[in-house]
Each structure stands twice: as C-alpha cells, then as structure tokens.
C-alpha cells in the first residue's frame, strides 16, 4: 500500500500502513475531523475534483481537518499527476489530504472506518455506491447528493445533502458523441458548505452527530439488510415468475 500525505502534523492516533516499496511499516496519523472517500479516479462519474477543491477551500485555514482519498485503480499514475496539479492551483492550505493507493488489509480498513467522521460522495450519478453504504452501516454520516440510486438511502437525517441539478451528458459507449442521457451537476458551494457544517457538528454538536450516525446505520438497515432484501426478492419472484414460498 502506497500513501501520499499532504500537509498535517503527527499525533497519537494513527493507522498502520505497509509501504509496498520496501515493506517498512509507516504511521499515517488521522486526527481531528476526518473525511473519507473511496473511488476509482478514472471513473468520470465520481467528480473527485470537487471533493478535493471544496475541501481545501472550506478548510484553507483549518489545521485539524483531514481528507482521506482511497484510490481503487491499480495504477498510481491514474491520479497522482492530476492531484498534484490541483494542489498547484489551490495554493497554500492548512488542512491535510492523505491519498491511499493499493490493497488494505481488513484490520487497516476497519481502522480507517473507525477514524472517519463523514464519508464524502460528490458523484454525478451512481449505480449503488457500496463504500458509502458500508460506511453508513458503520454509523458514519454522509456528505452526499440525493440523486440516482443514492436517493434510496440518503436523506437529511443521516447526513448533509449536497444540492445538485440535471445536465445533459454523453454515455461512455456512445460512438456519435451526442447528448443522449442526463446526469447531475453538483452544486460546488453546497458541497463546501456541507464540509463547514459537518466540521461544526463534530466539534460543537456531539449529540447531533450521534443522532446522524445512528440514523445512517438505520437507513442502510432499512434499505439493504438481509431481511429486507430477502423480502423484496420474494415479492419479485412471486410476482414475475409465479414462485411460491
């Protein structure tokens, strides 16, 4: 597992990460208010540029805010140059970004979830977003839009909803490059404000945070628990195939 750390200072709380190049064990410290997002950087839907730039803008003068970007693409080159370019454009900032690249052992991944306060999604469209659901199931509130499939489990009780609006788009496999579909454009200001609001909640409103965390877990339980999925599948099979149970 490789990691790239931008800004920030070490503290007592840490996550152990193995550096693949020399097999040495390094400490990646995660303290203060921690945000996490997991995505393939080559997937244009994920809109991670807004995640990074809104974070650095919202917390330009905040030293104890950390954004963890867990990259799922096999190639380090899939994001490193682009991420570095964003930093050049942003100028100086006191907040911290940690980019993780490579496989994480289960224990390391669980520590990352435990250290996280909010999971961040700024996608233009989603088919499900399993990492978001996983973090919410572990009582981590979301900063995310309420569109496409996320509309099934994102609401204001379990996170901070980012505003979005429809815009035309070209399907990835469209040879003629015509606008044949729609997606959602994220409201950047809304995302930046959600960062600021979430930070204030963690720092000054612990009871509000606990309620959001509990609601996040409950939302996923109502949407995708084994009992719920089993019942939905049973209804579908009975209706469409005439199966009896």
Where are these regions (language model features)?
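Aromatic "clamp/platform" in nucleotide-sugar-dependent glycosyltransferases that forms part
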Residues: 124
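A charged, aromatic-enriched C-terminal amphipathic alpha-helix characteristic of glycosyltransferases
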Residues: 182-193, 203-235
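Short hydrophobic beta-strand element within catalytic cores of glycosyltransferases
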Residues: 141-144, 160-162
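Short acidic alpha-helix that forms the nucleotide-activated donor recognition element
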Residues: 104-116, 133, 137, 170-172
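A short alpha->beta transition loop at the rim of the catalytic pocket in nucleotide-sugar-dependent
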Residues: 117, 139, 146
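Conserved donor-binding/catalytic core segment of Leloir-type glycosyltransferases
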Residues: 24-46, 52-55, 67-69
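Nucleotide-activated donor-binding/catalytic signature segment of Leloir-type glycosyltransferases, i.e.
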Residues: 77-111, 118
């Amino acid at each position: 597992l490789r990691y790239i750390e931008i800004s920030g200072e070490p503290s007592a709380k840490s996550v152990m990460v193995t550096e693949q190049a020399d097999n040495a064990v390094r400490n990646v410290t995660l303290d203060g208010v921690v945000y996490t997002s997991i995505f393939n950087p080559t997937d244009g839907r994920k809109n991670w540029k807004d995640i990074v730039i809104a974070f650095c803008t919202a917390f330009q003068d905040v030293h104890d805010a950390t954004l963890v970007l867990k990259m799922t693409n096999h190639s380090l080159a899939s994001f490193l140059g682009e991420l570095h370019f964003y930093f050049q454009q942003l100028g100086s900032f006191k907040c911290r970004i940690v980019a993780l690249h490579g496989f994480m052992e289960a224990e390391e991944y669980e520590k990352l979830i435990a250290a996280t306060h909010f999971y961040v999604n700024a996608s233009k469209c989603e088919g499900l977003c399993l990492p978001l659901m996983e973090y919410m199931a572990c009582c981590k509130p979301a900063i995310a839009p309420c569109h496409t499939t996320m509309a099934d489990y994102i609401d204001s009780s379990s996170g901070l909803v980012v505003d979005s609006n429809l815009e035309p788009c070209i399907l990835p496999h469209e040879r003629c490059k015509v606008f044949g579909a729609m997606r959602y454009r994220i409201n950047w200001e809304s995302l930046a404000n959600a960062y600021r609001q979430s930070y204030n909640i963690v720092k000054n409103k612990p009871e509000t945070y606990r309620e959001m965390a509990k609601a996040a877990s409950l939302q996923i339980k109502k949407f995708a628990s084994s009992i719920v999925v089993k019942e939905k599948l049973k209804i579908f099979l009975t209706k469409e195939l005439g199966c009896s149970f």
